[in-house]
Amino acid sequence: MADKKAPAAGWPVANGEYVVGNPESCVAVVTLGSHGLDQAAIDAGAAISGPCHTENLGIEKVVANYISNPNIRFMVITGSEVQGHITGQCIKALYENGIGDDGGIIGAKGAIPFMENVGTEPVGRLQSQIVECIDLIDVEDTGKISDAIKNCISKDPGAFEEEPMVIELEGGAAAAGEESTSIKPTSPEMALLEARMRIVSEKMNEAAMIAKFNSGYYNGKIQGIAIGLFLSIVIFSLL
């Protein structure tokens, strides 16, 4: 039997609409925007299963719950993709590419894919701990999902060698004896506001560039007309 470790006290550490199974299971499931899939995932042997609707705060909670349980080594992304947020693709991009210096998920296509409370260390831990990400985005067939979970369990490599990493998303204290990363919490409202301000700033810069181009274009056009009229007058005066 594969070696197992105790997850962080009170696991899952981040609250949400999760269904929790055996915490020693090596599989965690994200059901994105679908409903009614979580219990089937738990029945198939998953440690935790739940939806993820947003590409920022929602993903942060997924990361927090996964890295605080070293037994989780496989991540199954399934269920219907969340329109606009494109959360499934963002989670996959986070696992494959990580985040940039600004906290943005590299290669993510969601509206606001920024990690405000999760830094490079927790993301790196997720990338090291998870040995395989199974892409079943837009799959709602419980049979296929169950088969994927059971296949992962058959390949269980055992618990990750490091202790649980606890992220204080909401200012909670880490339990004694656990590896913790203290991150200054940001309220959901501020996180979204800052991200939207960045987007507005980018749009304003784009608009300024377009306005500058148009201004130069029209100024050049007027100058061309003036020069043409001047040359016409000169030519007619010589006739």
Swiss-Prot record:
Part of a complex that catalyzes the formation of methyl-coenzyme M and tetrahydromethanopterin from coenzyme M and methyl-tetrahydromethanopterin. This is an energy-conserving, sodium-ion translocating step. One of its GO terms (cellular component) is plasma membrane. It holds the Pfam family MtrA. The gene is mtrA. GO terms for molecular function: cobalt ion binding; tetrahydromethanopterin S-methyltransferase activity. Its cofactor is 5-hydroxybenzimidazolylcob(I)amide. It is found in: Cell membrane. It comes from Methanococcus maripaludis (strain DSM 14266 / JCM 13030 / NBRC 101832 / S2 / LL). Binds 1 5-hydroxybenzimidazolylcobamide group. This is Tetrahydromethanopterin S-methyltransferase subunit A. Residues 1-215 are cytoplasmic. Pathway: One-carbon metabolism; methanogenesis from CO(2); methyl-coenzyme M from 5,10-methylene-5,6,7,8-tetrahydromethanopterin: step 2/2. Residues 239 are extracellular.
